[in-house]
A protein has these predicted regions:
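Phosphate/NTP-binding elements of NTP-utilizing enzymes
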Residues: 1-167, 175-192
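GGW-centered surface loops in extracellular recognition modules
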Residues: 172
Length: 193
């Protein structure tokens, strides 16, 4: 059976880089597992069994009219909100038409946007997405020494944003001990804890 995969990212160059990594993995398969190749370039791969992989930037028209078994969306929180909204409006009919279609969304959080709504709705079981978090400390080779070196090479703020997923200027609402809703930044909340 053939499989159609869409790799979409906030920038076309990022999607092409992901396709290049997948291409390298394919090249390292034993020859007997590799299918014949019909198309092999920076933007797509097509195999003789009919399977296709497309790499593109996320936009409303990027995959319109196409059908996919797997749709991989990278750094989706960095796709402008109006683009993310129109993208899902145009692609959702395709997603729901397949019985086994999978949508995989990967991102570092980036403010309160389409990704934020999807994530928080998933946490509250308001949609069918399954939120999965991978903390930096779960990645082999990343320990306290790695953290300290990374902070020394960048900054504590950058580490919190990129690895702890805490944006210092991200505004949130919290309920204080008196039941009063207050707006605060993630940085202020982080310092309070």
């Amino acid at each position: 059976d053939s499989v159609n995969i869409g790799i979409l990212a906030n920038k076309a160059s990022t999607a092409r880089e992901l396709l290049a990594r997948l291409s390298t993995a394919y090249e390292n398969l034993p020859k007997w597992m590799q299918q014949g190749i019909l198309v092999w370039n920076k933007g797509n791969i097509e195999l003789e069994n009919g399977s296709k992989i497309l790499a593109s930037s996320t936009s409303a028209s990027a995959v319109r009219g196409m059908s996919f078994n797997i749709l991989f969306l990278d750094e989706f929180a960095f796709v402008p909100n109006h683009v993310a909204d129109s993208f899902f409006a145009s692609v959702y009919p395709t997603i729901t038409s397949g019985k086994s279609t999978k949508v995989i969304i990967v991102s570092t959080p980036h403010g309160m946007n389409h990704f934020y709504r999807m994530w928080h709705d998933a946490e509250r079981n308001k949609n069918e997405y399954i939120p999965t978090e991978v903390h930096w400390s779960e990645v082999p080779g990343r320990d306290v020494v790695w953290k300290e070196q990374t902070i020394a090479n960048t900054s504590e703020e950058q580490f919190r944003v990129e690895f702890e997923c805490l944006g210092g200027d991200t505004e949130i609402e919290i309920l204080d001990d008196n039941g009063i809703v207050q707006k605060t930044s993630m940085e202020n909340l982080y310092e309070r804890l």
